[in-house]
Amino acid sequence: MNSEVIKKGVERAPHRSLLRATGIIKDEADFQKPFVAIANSFAEIVPGHAHLNEFVKEIKEAVREAGGVPFEFNTLALCDGIAMNHPGMRYSLPSRELVADSVETMVQGHRFDGLICIPNCDKIVPGMLMAAVRLNIPTIFVSGGPMKAGRAKDGRPIDLISVFEGIGAFRAGKIDAGDLLELEQAACPGYGSCAGMFTANSMNCLCEALGLALPGNGTILAVDPRRSELKKWAGRQIVELIKRDLRPRDIVTPEAIDNAFALDVAMGGSTNTILHLLAVAQEAGINYPLKRVNLISARTPTLCKISPASSLHIEDVDRAGGVSAVLGELSRKPGLLNLDCLTVTGETLGETVGQVQSLDPRVIRGVEEPLSPVGGLKVLFGSLAPEGAVVKTAAVVPQMMRHQGPAVVFNSEAEASAAILGGRIKHGDVVVIRFEGPKGGPGFMEMLGPTAALVGMGLGESVALVTDGRFSGGTRGACIGHVCPEAASGGPIALIKDGDLISYDLEAGTLELLVPQEELAARKAAFTPPLRQGLTGWLARYVQMVAPASIGAVLRPACGRPPGEQDYE
């Protein structure tokens, strides 16, 4: 056991003395048991994490009962919703790296034998996933659970995105201040990750497909008593994984990442999932090509449309059978999933989900009667995005699947939001927001403010938005993000001028800037990236280390196994 280095032998008497002082060691027999790290992420200001201080207790009890010794520690958690649309959002994606590094530091410093990760919200899940494959000790994930959808006064289900879009509706005179207040008060009824197929719930679902979480992890509500049984199972199962020496890199293989993307596109997950899965692959030493997402999306049908793409929420998916039902339906068509991949259940994916069926085809369609024959995410390439851009096609209306329009260019999210809410954008425009990439922002801010404003102002079905920033999982509409190379690196997006024609075709996977090459070359020669003044602290270091979005915006040098050790095509 790893932990023997801190508890075995005469030389470790001081270590044992300190361990006794914690109160965790109950008797001498505890020194013979595996030490299990429990990486919690409790934070009172984050509704998806505010309950985790109580949540963890049953997990620790189950570890004890199974023959392990649990040691809980905490890492940071940032609420993307509260950080949205102000400078705090610059810290959102960088916080992913801090989560990964803090978990690595605690586990390596104390030589734990196994790890239980308790994340829930947007950057905490991928941060812990990155740490898990980096550390490569037996690990299991159990999330805090999704939030129940709210209810408007007319009974319709609502969520946080309803409030963001309500701001635009209020500015457009469609609702009054009282209506907006009612949305605000009803949209988020309690603990849990926000109720739609946004980034947090997308990532918690993908943990099941990757094989690192038990069935039910992604969809059982935070307030559902069944989550108690899931926690106890996780506490028992980690001890079994330690006995079997089943490690994350035995589970998170290139084929397992394919499975995660298949689930992702079948459920119309957040575009952020592409960023995060690429980062997890990098940490596992896998060079996973961005273009492969299109291959998977082209062969994988869309079986669900969840908020923001419909009025359905994660609780509806759970009622219909959860992630296991989606994977079970996909497994009925050969070639969509790699069913031999291992999971933390101790079984293969096929053994875990092969007999599970949808309990409600209105929520989870069968593979032979899908909502769409192709998946809900797409990677675009072209003269505006030579290294790629991403879009959630599942949330795009049919008339915006192809579009050509004049660019209206902004050098920050704040400028764009003000223009949209000020009525300066018209039908047919292509809003361009640049210098918001990983390096240029810095921090790769989410553009939920402007995208929600477009919907609220009645422009969501006639205006496109293109950015080197990224989007909330709650974004809907023709919103194309992660444009690479980003403006701060001199990518073509930096050269766009107001009125330039931009064309895209989401089915063909193209994104083009319709400006002659000679003109672009002249603009490139004259281009000087703007200097961001006053950048200090962590973000100043982040700018120097962050890699492009096309490989997950990880920090260089890459951690884990050396990059290129395992190429995947």
UniProtKB/Swiss-Prot annotation:
Homodimer. Binds 1 [2Fe-2S] cluster per subunit. This cluster acts as a Lewis acid cofactor. It catalyses: (2R)-2,3-dihydroxy-3-methylbutanoate = 3-methyl-2-oxobutanoate + H2O; (2R,3R)-2,3-dihydroxy-3-methylpentanoate = (S)-3-methyl-2-oxopentanoate + H2O. GO terms for biological process: isoleucine biosynthetic process; L-valine biosynthetic process. It is an enzyme of class 4 (lyase). Pathway: Amino-acid biosynthesis; L-isoleucine biosynthesis; L-isoleucine from 2-oxobutanoate: step 3/4; Amino-acid biosynthesis; L-valine biosynthesis; L-valine from pyruvate: step 3/4. Mg(2+) binds at D80, D122, K123, E446. Its EC number is 4.2.1.9. [2Fe-2S] cluster binds at C121, C194. Signal peptide: none annotated. This is Dihydroxy-acid dehydratase. Functions in the biosynthesis of branched-chain amino acids. Catalyzes the dehydration of (2R,3R)-2,3-dihydroxy-3-methylpentanoate (2,3-dihydroxy-3-methylvalerate) into 2-oxo-3-methylpentanoate (2-oxo-3-methylvalerate) and of (2R)-2,3-dihydroxy-3-methylbutanoate (2,3-dihydroxyisovalerate) into 2-oxo-3-methylbutanoate (2-oxoisovalerate), the penultimate precursor to L-isoleucine and L-valine, respectively. The active site is at S472 (proton acceptor). The lineage of its organism: Bacteria, Bacillati, Bacillota, Clostridia, Thermoanaerobacterales.
